Amino acid sequence: MIEARLVESVANRTRLQDGPVSFHSVTTDSRNDSKTALFVPLSGERFNGHHYLESAIESGAIAAIWQENEPVPMSIPASFQLYFVDDPLHALQELAQRYRDEVNPYVIGITGSNGKTTTKDIVFQLLGGEPFVHRTAGNLNNHIGVPLTLLSMPKECKFAVVEMGMNHAGEISLLSKLAKPDLAIVTNIAKPISST
């Protein structure tokens, strides 16, 4: 459960109404069942997540992080809460880092060229599983997936088993700053295979 005060701490300004003071989840996908969720619209070269706010609301989102220079659609109810930021991805990462610090679990970071997901699942089982052990869902192990993993931790979490992947130089450094692992497991490191 993410409290609104934590989201406010990463925002430049807010559009708040009387309403919920916490979010059951954080999502970047407007198609997900998002009952009482905080929606974070991300943008890429070929898409703009801000265009899917109405869909996120239909899926149950009750608030959104919103980029300052994006116009708010007129169809959005005035009661819908918005947290204005310069960069939604950076805000997502910062929010995850702050939430990780607040929950303060013992974090086990797992990386390597292969075997990360299997190792993560084994460590999760060895530590006793839910509800006190949290793990990366599937292989959400990048600059978006790791923040979502951290933000989905229950407050009573004692251990977090976080998978960290890399597809460019410096990515593990960023993910380590977010997750702040207490223990690191490196499965193996292989040279990337290049095709011609």
Residue ranges of model-derived segments:
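Phosphate-binding loop of NTP-binding sites
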Residues: 8, 89-196
